[in-house]
Amino acid sequence: MPSMKHNLLALLASGTALASIPALAQEANKPLELNTVVIQSDGNGGTTRSEGLGPVKGFVPRATTTGSKDSVAIDKIPQSVSVVGRDQMDALGAQKIDEALRYTPGVLAQPFGVDNDTNWLYIRGFDATANGTYLDGLQNFSYGFGGFLIDSFGIERIDVLRGPASALYGGANPGGIVNYISKRPTGERLRYLEAGINSYGNGYLGFDIGDKATETVNYRVNGKIQGGDNYTDFSKEFRGVISPSIEYKPDESTSLTILANYTHLDLTHDGGFLPYYGTVVPTEFGKISRKANFTEPDVDSYDREQLSIGYEFEHTFDSDWTIRQNVRYGFANVREHSLYPYGYDGFLMQPAAGNPYLARINFKHDTTVNTFQADNQLEGKVTTGAIDHNLLFGAEYRYFRIDQMQQTGGATIIDAYNPVYGEPQGPMWDPYIDQDLRRNQVGVYAQDRMEFGDGWILTLNGRYDHIWTEASGLPSFEYDTGRFSGRAGLGYEFENGITPYVSAATFFNPIIETLYDGSYAKPETGVQYEAGVKYRPTFFDGLITASFFDLTKENSLTGSSFAREQLGKVNSRGFELEMQANIAEDWKVTASVTAYDLKVKENASDESLVGKRPYLLPEQQASVFVEYTVPEGALKGVTLGGGVRYVGSSYADEQNTLKVPAVALADLKIGYEKDNWGIDLNVTNLFDKDYVAGCQGVYVCGYGEGRKALLRVHTKW
């Protein structure tokens, strides 16, 4: 798409020239005095920070802190931004983060089907699970099995910034980031209780309580306890989550919010890791049951203890300059033991004649993670000539330490079509990873959002990061790297609510990986060009976003996990369309279309893969969900909702010879509200379609979840 790149660069260059026109006009009459500074009262599109962090009314967001770190109207961000608020999460019946994002453009959620201990997310074709998720603006980085699992019950909203975010957040997923915004004190009395149970017999009880403690102190506590069976055989769980928060606000200029969370999770695994032959296509024995789980029930275990505590401090001076400090400490210990299938007996892709047995891997790990992050910001607004500057300066520090042990052991084979459990398993072998790894990262950044000429918006970002990584034990290595990232965006706000924009952004993503020759992997790098339009209609409450983008990632890892090379380049370019609307008070709609062209552009170790699509990833997605509430009459308070999700076909192999079919799924919601009580029934995969969600190679396929009904009852007072 070279013409697109040239046009975008030309537009950006013309935007820079336009920014100087008012100043040149002034210079013709008298000298421009740059040292004369005028403080502005508003440069964020009429938004406050609470709007960028707080609840979303219905389905339509207005502001975000994710696309610029300061709270700003979404229309002013020169990239695509989606927000899923609590109202939309509840309408969808989402009980996990990945369930809440199934209707969001550019996001591939649950690519392996059900996984109750991980929120798997891909954005614009790139995996955001480990390095593209954030909680309250601070990264939830994970490596190996050392990460943090966030429960959706404690989340107020989910912001998705599509495209590179390194210019704001440092090293991150090139396809975009997902920022979970915690529920926090509002200063209003809140008493909310919710109970639910699904068709598997998995039930929960949740609460959300908040109020004023004094004139200057507000509090909020939410939590959930949940337990029962899950979708596949032998899969069950018990989890408890509690998230207390307190806000101290002595005056309108100062606030300190303390946010904490404790999570306990005890479960048995969902299964998965199924072969392509036997799931997507049948073998001589037929197809493997979609509820089959080939672990050992007496062995399988997953235990998570997780804690985080931090604060957000903000003070605005009389000059309207604001300082902020966001800090969080996190701890997690995760222990797992399970058996996973890996092909058929002999580790074959297809079963030998008359042999229905699966090979299995006996896997165990013990992982402890400690993290600390501090993000310091200075924000202010000044005017130079005819240009209003919204300035942001920041310095961030991140510390990540993981102490991990991973080992495998002997495992018996098991019949894929008539499994028998309980055979003794072989002993565990010596660990192949026994490591203490530490990573320190320091980043400094600046942003200037310039507004001029009755509608022009020019946004410039720059950030430099340096990262030190040191690992002792097995394996051991030491490495440090630094990189600059930038973003430039130009937009124009018309009075009718239309805002076209163009942007270019560079990125880097430091990865922890040793290559086949013993060297350390370089950071993934690249650039994205994006052009789009955002439309906020004046005749109904809505937001429509359309975008074209061209994103290239270099230094992509290739080869097997035991012989990694870094010789690849992958390109993702395409189109995204999203509409979120509150049509009157009774109708709410969210709809999206995603169309990509995902291709391997370089692979020096295997040139036959050039031009192929990476496995697992579909190139088309589309969805629509509509909710209607009867406003009056005998059926007043009744809510009807429904949606359709389409996920296009993908491949199970690098050569693109084994296809995973596309699927269209229907969802249903029926609800009733009266006074302070409500009851809702959500049914996902309404017609109980049997399908494979995706395959990460021919040995690792996962069924999509069958029909699931969730009944919820809630009250507030």
Q: What residue ranges belong to the model's regions?
A:
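C-terminal beta-signal and adjacent terminal beta-strands/loops
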Residues: 645-653, 672-717
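Gram-negative outer-membrane beta-barrel transporters
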Residues: 550, 567-654, 690, 712-716
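Membrane-embedded beta-barrel scaffold of Gram-negative outer-membrane proteins
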Residues: 314-318, 322-328, 332-340, 523-582, ...
